[in-house]
């Protein structure tokens, strides 16, 4: 039988009440973006389900991409037939005959979305199961652990038959919860933070601080590749590359070495906040995990956060490094993150950074230098690259938007 349909089931979207249509529309838009290479696919959506009509496109390739789209609870490759008993029986038998081998077991499960259908769920299971048994050899029923599990979904307009459910990414559709900026360094942690931000329905724009000649073009490319990898979960992402060399050089000259890391983080946050405001985002995400390094103690976070009233969200705050690495491997960012190209924070790491910096002290040290012109210059000269799951990218400058 020609399995030319994919049934998509929603997760948390189903709890959204009156706003459900907005979430479904966003999910449909995201799926279309991720599947833009598959030009023959057609989309049908209702309040409770979405159906993709493949029109001959590669089903396995389409499903491989759907696994990463947030907002999908599960999905199934399906055969479609008319909603009448004889048509369902014929389609079910033909589908099972294509799949089974002698000695296999099977089970039939029916869901009646169309309650006016002539048989109820139990009657349908018995009718279809009996029809299959009478017309196959060496195939038996096992309702607990079958080799073949035939699921039948009866709707008024059509009936769909499936044999396997694929787990989706869960969460909420990217973009349904607003926009946030992700501070991305090129390390292991920040892409994972971006993943979790997107899972909760946020559209992200990434911000990376680039300090040539201290950091190389290969380090920049690593961040581009990481951001591109995240596009698999929700479509295009803007990456803002901030020129940070002058600012870091001034920090090295004017701020005591043990407080230079704190000053660097504070200035990065101020620049990210200005970009957030310019691009109409509402929060900033970081990959910080409490106590992991000197700049991620509670005292450091307090001193750094003091430069902004914008929410700074840290989804990895309670995770240890092993957990973060496992998630990075799962989402395929780990191998990119461990490429041996250092970012600007690594290059300028002091030998003995202050692990419990005082907010009053860093404010005192910074008061002798006017960093504002360099902050504004960095924002104005920020380069923006629009990354997508397709091969090409677009270079733009931040002031274009």
From Swiss-Prot:
HAMAP family the record matches: ThiI (MF_00021)
Residue ranges constituting the THUMP domain according to the UniProt record: 60-165
UniProt KW RNA-binding keyword: yes
Protein name: Probable tRNA sulfurtransferase
PROSITE patterns associated with the record: THUMP (PS51165)
Its job: Catalyzes the ATP-dependent transfer of a sulfur to tRNA to produce 4-thiouridine in position 8 of tRNAs, which functions as a near-UV photosensor. Also catalyzes the transfer of sulfur to the sulfur carrier protein ThiS, forming ThiS-thiocarboxylate. This is a step in the synthesis of thiazole, in the thiamine biosynthesis pathway. The sulfur is donated as persulfide by IscS.
Listed pathway(s): Cofactor biosynthesis; thiamine diphosphate biosynthesis
Reaction catalysis annotation: [ThiI sulfur-carrier protein]-S-sulfanyl-L-cysteine + a uridine in tRNA + 2 reduced [2Fe-2S]-[ferredoxin] + ATP + H(+) = [ThiI sulfur-carrier protein]-L-cysteine + a 4-thiouridine in tRNA + 2 oxidized [2Fe-2S]-[ferredoxin] + AMP + diphosphate; [ThiS sulfur-carrier protein]-C-terminal Gly-Gly-AMP + S-sulfanyl-L-cysteinyl-[cysteine desulfurase] + AH2 = [ThiS sulfur-carrier protein]-C-terminal-Gly-aminoethanethioate + L-cysteinyl-[cysteine desulfurase] + A + AMP + 2 H(+)
EC number: 2.8.1.4
Annotated family: Belongs to the ThiI family.
GO CC entries: cytosol
A single GO molecular function term of this UniProt record: tRNA binding
SUPFAM superfamilies the UniProt entry points to: Adenine nucleotide alpha hydrolases-like, THUMP domain-like
Keywords, alphabetical: ATP-binding, Cytoplasm, Nucleotide-binding, RNA-binding, Thiamine biosynthesis, Transferase, tRNA-binding
Binding site for ATP: 183-184, 208-209, 265, 287, 296
UniProt cross-references to SMART domains, sorted A to Z: THUMP (SM00981)
Domain of life: Bacteria
